[in-house]
């Protein structure tokens, strides 16, 4: 696959990571460069940051700290219940449970690799796997809990480096009529608003609709609805 490098934003430290010292020694920096993939039409970081450097037991961002996000997830949960009436739901990147907690009346499973956050949802009696989302994990979850009517993921899929495996794992965990709901930054909106700050270590990709179609069709998934949100 041919890649065209087109933007170099220099060296940056890890985000969402508070360090113990004012001037820590050997702080990790990465080269923030962007690439365009000619076949898939994906925009990605030229070099990915190792996931465990970003997502670990010191991860700082908690979605429920924002009143706006708390209300947005509560509203979205109501919308999903009304439209799809799921009997089971899986969230990839469940953070501190701000979304998945609204589905306590059905089978609700979280996947969250940051242990400090996974511990929070476990205390909320939400079964949470403190693992990175992979095909192997999807098989393990299927074996124990069955497949799901809805799989939801907000601001997480763009963080995962192996996209083909990611979507195959999602397809593997959905019921025949199941729905996957993805919420991530839009390349179009980022360009229209000159939001270059959407490009950083966690955002391995920033998706266009064309790129998403090219990736999801490999896994047997089909895009049937697109909405623009104001929360990211």
Question: Residues of each region from the PLM?
Answer:
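N-terminal juxtadomain amphipathic helix
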Residues: 1-67, 227-228
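Conserved class I S-adenosyl-L-methionine
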Residues: 85-95
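Conserved SAM-binding loop of SAM-dependent methyltransferases across substrates and taxa
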Residues: 96-106
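Conserved SAM-binding motif I beta-strand of class I
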Residues: 107-112
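Conserved SAM-binding strand-loop segment of SAM-dependent methyltransferases
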Residues: 124-140
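A conserved beta-strand element that flanks and buttresses the S-adenosyl-L-methionine
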Residues: 152
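A short glycine-rich, Lys/Arg-flanked "PGG" loop and its adjoining helix->strand segment in the class I
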Residues: 164-181
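Short, glycine-/aromatic-enriched active-site segment of Class I SAM-dependent methyltransferases
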Residues: 182-205, 209-210
């Amino acid at each position: 696959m041919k890649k065209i490098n087109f933007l170099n934003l220099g060296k940056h430290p890890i985000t969402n990571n508070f360090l113990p010292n004012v001037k820590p020694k050997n702080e990790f920096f990465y080269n923030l460069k962007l690439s365009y993939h000619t076949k898939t039409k994906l925009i990605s970081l030229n070099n990915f940051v190792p996931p465990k450097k970003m997502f670990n037991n010191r991860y700082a961002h908690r979605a429920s700290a924002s009143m706006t996000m708390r209300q947005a997830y509560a509203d979205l949960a109501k919308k999903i219940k009304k439209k799809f009436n799921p009997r089971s739901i899986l969230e990839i990147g469940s953070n501190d449970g701000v979304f998945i907690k609204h589905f306590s009346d059905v089978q609700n499973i979280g996947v969250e690799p940051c242990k400090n956050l996974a511990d929070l949802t476990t205390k909320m009696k939400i079964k949470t796997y403190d693992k990175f989302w992979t095909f192997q994990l999807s098989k393990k979850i299927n074996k124990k809990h069955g497949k799901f009517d809805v799989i939801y993921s907000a601001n997480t899929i763009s963080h995962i480096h192996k996209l083909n495996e990611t979507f195959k794992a999602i397809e593997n965990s959905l019921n025949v009529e199941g729905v996957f709901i993805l919420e991530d930054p839009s390349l179009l909106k980022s360009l229209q608003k000159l939001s270059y700050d959407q490009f950083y270590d966690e955002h391995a990709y920033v998706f266009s609709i064309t790129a998403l179609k090219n990736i999801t069709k490999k896994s047997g998934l089909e895009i049937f609805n697109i909405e623009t949100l104001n929360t990211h």
